[in-house]
Every structure is written in structure tokens, then in C-alpha cells.
Amino acid sequence: VICLKYRTPAQPPSRRTAGGALENAMSTPHLPRVPLLEPAQMSPEQKRIHDVIASGPRGQVRGPLAVWLHRPAMAERAQALGQYCRYETSLPTRLSEWAILVMARHWRSEYEWWAHKPLALKAGVSAPMIDALRNGEPVPYSHPDEALVHEFLTVLHETRHTPDDLYRRVVHVLGEAGVIDLVSIAGYYTLIAMTLGVFDIQPPEGTPPELGGAA
């Protein structure tokens, strides 16, 4: 495990309310660092991309897509890649959702974890596996391919390298197409985690954090 030390963030500044009183930013509802656009605020191109996303399998525009909508050409291309990575790869949904949770855990991405934990459970990833991943404990895998996906992604992130033996094993189990898809999922959800982190996109108010205290 690679441990990094961060400076404690400064206390958020106080701000003046509409009535003139001072209040600390911590007492106000959480707001992301960029405004999330309402349809009435969108340009014609933004509205077009918004409607494309909302009419697809996601059914709505939220999270990183809401940030990317400020750059509609980016949003259009990213949502197409995301649709492939989430719905159209050669991997079973059980493995793709497991891989997404591994990425969320690596990045400590509360939003990504919140959004995909129920999807992983629905796809057949066991609750004990998810709990162990969250807590940094040995994972009681239900299937050997889950262990291999976890190992592959962990080694890739910790060493920035894939040894020949590991590559051969993952190709043997997932096939060459499956490995390409797995790397694509990892890359796409890294982009998502970075976007969520930089622009401070959080789960809905009242959602308890699950990853902040993980080792």
C-alpha cells in the first residue's frame, strides 16, 4: 500500500448570507466547484447532448457527466465511451462492476462507490467481497475471475506495469478482447474519479461516507 501524507485543509471561509449574517461554509449544503446546469441555462449544443444522455440507458445526467456538459464536445465523446464501458463490453456485468468498485476504492471516490455499489450487488458481486474491499481486508472472492481482476488492477496501479505472467493469466481467463475492455473500464473510471475529485462532486446529502477511513 502506498501511503501519501496530505496537509490538513484550511477551514472553509465564512460568507455573508442574503440577510447579512456571517455563516461558515461548513454549515451550508454542499455545492460542487462548478455549477450544475439546469436545462434553461444550456446552450443549444449542451441541451442536445443533455437530451442524448438522458434518453439513453443512464436515464439522467448527473455526476461527472454534469461537469463535462460545460464542454459539450467532451461530454458527447465521454458519454459514448462510458456507454461502451458500462453496457457493451465483452465482460460480464459482475466483473465490470467489480472492476469499477476496485477503481473507486483506489481513488477513494465516494460518489463512484455510492453509484456503483448497488449495481455491483445486483450483478452478483457478494456483499462480503464489497465490504472487504472497502475495508482493505482479504477479499472472500466468489469466483476466481474476480480475484484475477482485482490482482490485475491492483498491480497495474501500484507498479504502473503488468508482468508477463500476470498478463498471460488474465488473457487466458478473459481473452484478449476482455483485457482490452478491462483496461478501458479502468481508464474511463479513473477519468471519472479524477473529475469527481477535482470538482468535488459528492453523493446526495445524508449519504454516509464509506471510503474515507479505509486503509
Regions found by a protein language model. Give the residues of each.
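Compositionally biased, intrinsically disordered low-complexity segments enriched in Pro/Arg/Gln/His
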Residues: 9-16
